[in-house]
């Protein structure tokens, strides 16, 4: 869920057959200018624990001494097992590096492999960056690490939107600005909703708010579009 909203120019009309029912058409020019763009933050957290009496170690794994390494990119990790801030994150990057000693191999000089990889792989298909790293110890004395990532998200087909009144819909298509309808004054809408969505959802007050908003905008006045109250 991304709670992000703004005032938009809305056209209530059927257009191209791609905004049937609750489908919404968006103006690509408006999206390119930043409409409904949002920065999404996500936190990855990992807490160390003891395995067979040995505490896990946060570091960049050495492939010559570590078994079980993932088919992933370890190159962005620093010596603390995290990726430096403001670094681009890509799919299959190791976001948290961690190893644990292999107890039976620790004192055996004939064994080259001394550790087992416990690193975490990051999965993403969007442009994502490391925003903040935080490492500390919990009440039991174990180390924990938090990595906050940030992604700038632009609305795409299939995203769901709702008006303040609760009229919901999903993006059915995104048209270039030149393909959007235009008024005699040269005004193009940011979004187009289908008029059939209002009676089917029984959101008549949505239409009331829309008409009242247009009137008070032209008159420069304040209005009350509340649907319920004292009569």
Regions found by a protein language model. Name each.
Residues 1-231:
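Conduit-forming functional cores of very large proteins
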């Amino acid at each position: 869920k991304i709670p992000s909203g703004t005032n938009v120019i809305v056209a209530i009309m059927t257009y191209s057959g791609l905004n049937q029912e609750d489908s919404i058409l968006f103006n690509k020019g408006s999206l390119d200018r930043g409409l409904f763009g949002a920065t999404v933050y996500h936190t990855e957290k990992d807490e160390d624990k003891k395995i067979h009496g040995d505490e896990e170690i946060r570091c960049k794994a050495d492939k010559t001494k570590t078994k079980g390494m993932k088919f992933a990119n370890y190159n962005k990790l620093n010596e603390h097992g995290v990726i430096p801030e403001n670094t681009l994150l890509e799919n299959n990057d190791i976001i948290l590096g961690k190893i644990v000693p292999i107890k039976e191999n620790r004192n055996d000089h004939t064994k080259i492999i001394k550790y087992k990889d416990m690193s975490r792989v990051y999965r993403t298909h969007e442009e994502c960056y490391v925003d903040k790293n935080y490492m500390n110890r919990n009440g039991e004395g174990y180390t924990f690490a938090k990595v906050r990532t940030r992604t700038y998200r632009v609305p795409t087909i299939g995203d769901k939107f709702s008006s303040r009144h609760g009229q919901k819909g999903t993006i059915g298509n995104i048209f270039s600005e030149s393909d959007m309808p235009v008024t005699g004054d040269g005004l193009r809408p940011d979004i187009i909703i289908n008029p059939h969505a209002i009676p089917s959802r029984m959101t008549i007050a949505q239409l009331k708010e829309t008409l009242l908003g247009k009137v008070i905008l032209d008159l420069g006045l304040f209005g009350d579009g509340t649907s319920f109250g004292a009569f």
